[in-house]
């Protein structure tokens, strides 16, 4: 299924891989996918994202990685089959386990954050196409506690739930052309609702909205001529629309800053809930599209060549959704790729 909207081709991987899936048995709670006895983590339904001369970027909240003894095996196999240039992760609980996994992947290298504790960030990138230049953990030098006033700039880290955004300066090349990118990995405060209450500095939605104000201001004033992609788990609970206060500084046309940004997965946000990145498989809450990729103005010119989608993990692994949630993640990855 292909939809052409907002100058972006939005592709559902679910439709693609459903045509190419094997004749395996129904997903079960105990078997690790449609693998075989030799390698139970060989997933024939998993689809390569790698395309010649394109940049592929995947964002994924990988839920307290590794949450299960099999998590690393699942994730390593999937990352290698997807074969994307750039992966941005949230919720890395064990840096050593992440490092161990990537060290066993000969084609990839990693960068981890220093400031986010046991729910950290990681960049994993393909050695043949990506050069890591530097990182900057934004607002890591600001207080991370509620000071009780309405000035969100003087305790910016608190607005980001003590997880300072990890800005990665990288260079992509295919050997004939190259592009510098600033990719900012975020993980906003969870919970609450979708009501902005400016009188309560501890309110979850208040903090998420302020986090977006900080980011839009930073990019507009410091990276206006650079290629910037903001990715991650925005935790935009409540109504799934461009006016949700969590994301509105990027997406609401009534807010001036939104003219500088484009959420490339907006059609997923405003589409059917069955296509959202978070399905609530083991939760009483309704599905929501929490995971986004947002570009700034210099990248608008590539809109017509940009493809985005949610990677449907139960289909990719031929594994029951509850098993996916408990052994891999309760979030599904979201990807974008484009011709630079």
Task: Identify the meaning behind each predicted range.
Residues 16-18:
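C-terminal motif of bacterial Sec signal peptides marking the signal peptidase cleavage site
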Residues 20-109, 115-121, 156, 212-213, ...:
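N-terminal, active-site-proximal structural segment of metallo-dependent hydrolase catalytic domains
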Residues 92-94, 98-189:
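Structured beta-strand-rich core segments of catalytic domains in phosphoester-bond hydrolases
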Residues 37-39, 160, 220-229, 236-340:
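Metal-dependent phosphoester-hydrolase catalytic domains
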Residues 1-9:
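Bacterial N-terminal signal peptides that target proteins for export
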Residues 54-64, 136-137, 180-193, 197:
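Active-site-proximal beta-strand elements of phosphoester/diester hydrolases
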Residues 59-71, 150-153, 192-207:
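Acidic/histidine-rich helix-loop elements
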Residues 56-59, 85-91, 111-113, 120-125, ...:
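Structural recognition of the beta-strand scaffold that forms the well-ordered cores
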């Amino acid at each position: 299924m292909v939809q052409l909207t907002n100058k972006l081709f939005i592709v559902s991987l679910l439709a693609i891989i459903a045509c190419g899936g094997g004749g395996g048995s129904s997903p079960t709670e105990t078997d690790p996918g449609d693998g075989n006895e030799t390698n139970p983590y060989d997933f024939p339904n998993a689809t390569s994202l790698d395309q010649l001369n394109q940049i592929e970027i995947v964002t994924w909240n990988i839920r307290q990685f590794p949450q299960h003894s099999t998590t690393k095996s699942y994730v390593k196999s999937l990352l290698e089959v997807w074969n994307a240039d750039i992966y941005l992760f949230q919720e890395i609980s064990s840096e050593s386990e992440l490092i161990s996994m990537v060290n066993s992947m000969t084609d990839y290298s990693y960068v981890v954050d220093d400031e986010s504790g046991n729910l950290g960030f990681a960049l994993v990138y393909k050695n043949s196409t990506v050069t890591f230049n530097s990182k900057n953990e934004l607002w890591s030098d600001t207080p991370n506690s509620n000071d009780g006033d309405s000035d969100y700039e003087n305790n910016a880290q608190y607005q980001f739930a003590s997880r300072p955004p990890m800005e990665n300066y990288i260079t992509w090349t295919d050997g004939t052309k190259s592009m510098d990118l600033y990719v900012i990995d975020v993980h906003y405060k969870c919970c609450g609702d979708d009501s902005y209450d400016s009188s309560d500095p501890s309110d979850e939605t208040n903090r998420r909205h302020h986090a977006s104000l900080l980011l839009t201001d930073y990019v507009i004033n410091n990276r206006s001529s650079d290629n910037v992609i903001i990715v991650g788990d925005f935790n935009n609970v409540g109504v799934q629309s461009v006016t949700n206060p969590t994301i509105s500084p990027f997406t609401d046309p009534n807010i001036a800053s939104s003219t500088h940004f484009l959420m490339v997965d907006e059609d997923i946000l405003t589409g059917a809930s069955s296509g959202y990145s978070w399905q609530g498989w083991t939760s009483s809450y309704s599905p929501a599209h929490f995971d986004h990729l947002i570009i700034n103005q210099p990248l608008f010119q590539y809109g017509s060549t940009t493809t985005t989608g949610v990677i449907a993990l139960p289909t990719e692994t031929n594994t029951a959704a509850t098993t996916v949630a408990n052994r891999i993640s309760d979030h599904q990855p979201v990807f974008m790729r484009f011709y630079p």
